[in-house]
Swiss-Prot record:
Belongs to the complex I 20 kDa subunit family. It catalyses: a quinone + NADH + 5 H(+)(in) = a quinol + NAD(+) + 4 H(+)(out). The lineage of its organism: Bacteria, Pseudomonadati, Pseudomonadota, Betaproteobacteria, Burkholderiales. Binds 1 [4Fe-4S] cluster. This is NADH-quinone oxidoreductase subunit B. Pfam families: Oxidored_q6. It comes from the Bacteria. Its cofactor is [4Fe-4S] cluster. Keywords: 4Fe-4S, Cell inner membrane, Cell membrane, Iron, Iron-sulfur, Membrane, Metal-binding, NAD, Quinone, Translocase, Transport, Ubiquinone. One of its GO terms (molecular function) is iron ion binding. It comes from Methylibium petroleiphilum (strain ATCC BAA-1232 / LMG 22953 / PM1). NDH-1 is composed of 14 different subunits. Subunits NuoB, C, D, E, F, and G constitute the peripheral sector of the complex. Its EC number is 7.1.1.-.
Amino acid sequence: MGIEGVLKEGFITTSADKLINWSKTGSLWPMTFGLACCAVEMMHAGAARYDIDRFGMLFRPSPRQSDLMIVAGTLCNKMAPALRRVYDQMAEPRWVLSMGSCANGGGYYHYSYSVVRGCDRIVPVDVYVPGCPPTAEALLYGILQLQAKIRRENTIAR
């Protein structure tokens, strides 16, 4: 059924899963957890050239108001409990995007005693964005991949 059928018939048919997942993908509110230089690229994604707002995203300062955590940068052992605490404060459904080599696996500091070798050891990660630092385009691509993953989820159990 095309748009002509919608205008003529006056209604749209879809499944509840598709409708719910569409609304989730169009209103992701990320909470920034910028730990190092990757956070600068995250700021570029929010600026006028890349305009992350066009995806319905609005950066939130509080974990209680957000459903996406973008971990950007080197995660040290002292910061790991704070990352977990912030993740636990986020409401369900929640997603985590790991941005950059340091957040993905420790990066250049992988063998340091004070660095966590990947934020996936602390919180479950949904999408990894590689690079050192990854560009704003790579972050936007990772967000698009997360939106595709959300669209494939089954919200209502069958």
